[in-house]
């Protein structure tokens, strides 16, 4: 598909690729490459596929709890925005409903709390950008407008971040500053 549509801006979606520490690293207990050499781990996916195709400008992944962002240049010098978001382990809504903390893990039972990533692409200006936000269909609010957001989730997901850093990891703008030089102007979008 990449060869057939060479030059078309491409976003790759995959499962276990980026960690909450912004590393291309699989969860060790399910690193399929360690079990079967035919499987590719995250670094191999970068080395064999993503970095080798100039049209790939973004990678979206999940699986590892929390959020991550890594921006690197591919073998052609183009930026690749690698974004991870996974909220399935969140359980504040269960706590709100009276569900006890899991006695074995010391964590709420993860049901996700309806959190999802929203990405709005804007190609109207001289530099295109992506607005990234995090919204809960349960709480019906964006993460930046929920007073308890960092208090509920930061400790278990990103304990080394400040509350402000944690909020910024779930709501930010990415300028796609090399997009037009790679793919042409907005007239074709």
For each predicted feature, which ranges?
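Metal-dependent phosphoesterase/phosphodiesterase active-site architecture
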Residues: 1-4, 66-189
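Active-site-proximal segments of metal-dependent phosphoesterases and phosphodiesterases across multiple
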Residues: 2-57
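Active-site metal-binding loops of divalent metal-dependent hydrolases
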Residues: 15-17, 62-64, 86-88
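Internal, well-ordered interaction modules that form the hydrophobic cores of assembly/scaffold domains
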Residues: 53, 63-66
């Amino acid at each position: 598909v990449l060869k057939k549509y060479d030059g078309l801006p491409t976003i790759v979606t995959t499962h276990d690729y980026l960690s909450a520490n912004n590393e291309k690293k699989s969860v060790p207990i399910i690193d399929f490459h360690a079990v079967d050499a035919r499987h590719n781990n995250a670094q191999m996916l970068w080395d064999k596929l993503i970095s080798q195709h100039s049209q790939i400008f973004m990678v979206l992944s999940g699986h590892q709890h929390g959020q991550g962002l890594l921006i690197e240049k591919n073998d052609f010098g183009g930026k690749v925005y690698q974004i991870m978001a996974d909220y399935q382990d969140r359980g504040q809504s269960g706590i709100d409903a009276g569900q006890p903390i899991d006695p074995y893990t010391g964590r709420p039972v993860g049901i996700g709390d309806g959190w999802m990533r929203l990405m709005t692409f804007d190609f109207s200006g001289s530099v295109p950008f992506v607005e990234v936000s995090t919204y809960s269909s349960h709480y019906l609010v964006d993460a930046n407008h929920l007073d308890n957001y960092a208090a509920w989730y930061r400790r278990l997901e990103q304990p080394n971040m400040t509350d402000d850093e944690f909020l910024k990891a779930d709501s930010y703008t990415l300028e796609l500053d090399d997009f037009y030089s790679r793919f042409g102007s907005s007239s074709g979008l």
